[in-house]
Amino acid sequence: MMISFDNIYDLYLYSNLALIGLIWTVQIVHYPSFLYIDKKKAFEFQDFHMKKITFVVMPLMLIEFFCGVILLYLNYKNPVFLVGFISLLLIWAWTFFVNVPIHTKLMKNYNDDLIHKLIKSNWPRTVLWSFKIVWVFIDINKR
């Protein structure tokens, strides 16, 4: 079986949809729930969270990334893929240079100020992923 453009596009779409559902759940429910964690168990919770969320998120982000690279390469003249890939790079940069360091700080000093900072700092990723999926749906409607 040969992998087609449509197969890659579908994987890209489905990984985006999964990540949209996940990021909005994290933004509205999961991160705010950090405020209710027993401070005595905060280190255990944060360790658990980081391991488990990585197990869920990283495969989806990698699929999205590699599909985005392939789609951009195959269709570099389509602004949907260029804008999508730039959005993806911004999401990755924000994740690893802003959100991950906050999680690391929470491992050492679990406090409400850092949790509020995490909630606030996650909005750009939430907005970018939402923006990106709108671009994909615009492209789908053109096909």
Feature roles, as predicted:
Residues 3-63, 107-116:
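Interfacial loop at the N-terminal end of multi-pass membrane proteins
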Residues 15-22, 60-71, 84-94, 98, ...:
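Membrane-embedded alpha-helical transmembrane segments of multi-pass integral membrane proteins
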Residues 55, 115-130:
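Individual transmembrane alpha-helices with interfacial aromatic-anchor signatures
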Residues 73-77, 111-112:
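Membrane-interface helix-boundary motifs at transmembrane edges
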Residues 78-83:
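Short, aromatic-rich membrane-interface segments at the entry and exit
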Residues 96-109:
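Transmembrane alpha-helical segments of integral membrane proteins
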Residues 136-143:
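Juxtamembrane boundary at the C-terminal end of a transmembrane helix
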